[in-house]
């Protein structure tokens, strides 16, 4: 997982026309799917973009996946601006892609691997880091955002794991 070859195999995919086309399609799909969301509160929304991110991370790996996450986040902001631009969210998208890649790239797809990736993403990325960004942007206490995000992510976690598994396993 942390070998030089592991990272190089992912980086090489960004130089292949075939994989560049896949990455471009995934970027377009993430933007389209991400534009459909259910608002929960001022900073919380429900989407199914995580399925596309997991799929892309499984195919292209960490290096290409993080570049794609960077491009997707910035294009999404240009096409669907929602408040002020904040680079922390770009880093969050890249970290989410990295976590999926480390758990799924060049590995057998299992419910356990998906559950680990989704749990880390939900609690570390969405709750811990996302709440920090919301607190910095909107000025309320960190605990206010963390509590709301914790409830939402805990409720959705089993559903997201099952949907991710059904999608990735059938492909």
Q: Where are the predicted features?
A:
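Loop-helix junctions at membrane interfaces
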Residues: 1-171
């Amino acid at each position: 997982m942390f070998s030089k070859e592991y990272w190089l195999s992912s980086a090489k995919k960004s130089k292949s026309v075939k994989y560049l086309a896949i990455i471009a399609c995934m970027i377009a799909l993430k933007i389209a799917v991400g534009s459909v969301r259910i608002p929960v509160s001022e900073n919380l929304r429900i989407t199914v973009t995580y399925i596309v991110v997991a799929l892309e991370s499984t195919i292209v790996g960490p290096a290409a996946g993080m570049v794609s996450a960077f491009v997707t986040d910035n294009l999404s902001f240009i096409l669907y601006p929602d408040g002020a631009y904040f680079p922390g969210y770009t880093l969050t998208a890249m970290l989410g892609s990295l976590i999926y890649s480390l758990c799924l790239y060049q590995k057998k797809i299992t419910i356990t691997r998906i559950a680990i990736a989704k749990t880390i993403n939900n609690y570390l990325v969405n709750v811990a880091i996302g709440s920090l960004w919301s607190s910095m942007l909107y000025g309320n206490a960190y605990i206010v955002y963390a509590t709301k995000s914790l409830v939402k992510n805990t409720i959705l976690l089993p559903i997201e794991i099952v949907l991710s598994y059904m999608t990735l396993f059938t492909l």
